[in-house]
C-alpha cells in the first residue's frame, strides 16, 4: 500500500463520481501500481521481470489473508493492459459459483476467445480458489492446458494444500507472508494523516498487534473505530473489535490461579458476557500470555496440550460454557501438578 502523498488512491473501477469518500479504506488505499505494494519486494521484482520480458506464466499466489495477493495481481494487470485493463480481465471470487459448471461455462467461454486487435493474452483471476471443488479443479486443469495461448490464470488462495497438485505444477508459485508490523505501520500512519484520525500512539500500536500481519484487518479496525469514536484510545480499539484487552487476560489468569474454581468461572463468564468476548479469542490470548507466566515448564506443557484439545473441540461447535470450565480446570490442574513435583 502506498505511503506517499498522492499515491494509494482508489483504483478506477467505474465508481460513481464522489463515491470515493464512501469507499471502505481497504479499497480506497489499495495500491494502484506494483511500486506501491507493501513488502514482498522479491515477488514484485520477479513479476516485473516477467512483464517486461512478456513471459508471464500462470501464477499461484498463496498465503494468509490481507497480505496483498489480490492487490498485487490487479497492479500487474494495470501494468500489462493499461487503464482499460478491466476489458482484458475476468475476476471470480468467493461470492461467485466456482463449481464445475462455472469452469465449463464462464471460464471456458472467456478463455476460448481473443480480443479483436489485442496482441496480448487475457487474464483470469480466481480468488479464494481453495473453495473450489475437486471436480472443478480438474476441469480447470484442462482449461489451463487448452487455452494457454489466449489466457493466463492467477489462482489465489489461503491454503495451498487445498489446491490440487496438478494445478500447482502448472503454475509459478508465490508465497505471501504476513506483513511486518513496520510495513503496516507506514500505511496506517498515511491513512491516519489522510483521514485526520484522532488516535493515541498506544491505540495505533494496538491496531498493529491485533492485525497480526493482515493489512486488510488493520485498515478495517481503524475505519470502524474512526466511525465510532471522535477520539480513539486503546480501550476504544478493543471495545470496537470485541477483542479481550491485555489487562482482562491478566485479570483472568490471576483469578484462575488464586480463586476457587466457581469464583474464577463466574468472574470470567461475567466479564465475557459484559464485553461480548469470544472464548476463542480468550483462549488465544491466554496461550500468548503463558510465555510470561512464571510456572514450571512441565506445567506449561500440560496446559498447552489441554488448550489445544479445547480449541479442537470448539471447532466442532461445542458449548462455550463447558469449554470455559475445561480451560479453567486445565490451568488449575497444570499449576497444581507443578507444585506437587516441587
Curated annotation (Swiss-Prot):
Keyword annotations from UniProtKB, A to Z: ATP-binding, DNA damage, DNA replication, Nucleotide-binding, Nucleus
Outcome recorded upon mutating residue 216 to W: Defective DNA replication
Domain of life: Eukaryota
Main localization, broad class: nucleus
Cellular component GO terms held in the UniProt record: chromatin; Ctf18 RFC-like complex; cytosol; DNA replication factor C complex; Elg1 RFC-like complex; nucleus; Rad17 RFC-like complex
Gene3D superfamilies assigned: 1.10.8.60, 1.20.272.10, P-loop containing nucleotide triphosphate hydrolases
GO MF terms held by the record: ATP binding; ATP hydrolysis activity; DNA binding; DNA clamp unloader activity
BP GO annotations: DNA repair; DNA strand elongation involved in mitotic DNA replication; DNA-templated DNA replication; mitotic DNA replication leading strand elongation; UV-damage excision repair
Database matches in Pfam families: AAA (PF00004), Rep_fac_C (PF08542)
Protein's cellular compartments: Nucleus
Annotated positions binding ATP: 63-70
PANTHER family recorded: REPLICATION FACTOR C / DNA POLYMERASE III GAMMA-TAU SUBUNIT (PTHR11669), REPLICATION FACTOR C SUBUNIT 5 (PTHR11669:SF9)
Function: The elongation of primed DNA templates by DNA polymerase delta and epsilon requires the action of the accessory proteins PCNA and activator 1. Subunit 3 binds ATP. Also involved in replication and DNA damage checkpoint controls, probably functioning as a checkpoint sensor.
Assembly notes: Heteropentamer of subunits rfc1, rfc2, rfc3, rfc4 and rfc5 that forms a complex (RFC) with PCNA in the presence of ATP. Two other complexes exist where rfc1 can be replaced by either ctf18 or elg1 to form the ctf18-RFC or the elg1-RFC complexes respectively.
Family assignment from sequence similarity: Belongs to the activator 1 small subunits family.
Protein name listed in UniProt: Replication factor C subunit 3
Organism: Schizosaccharomyces pombe (strain 972 / ATCC 24843)
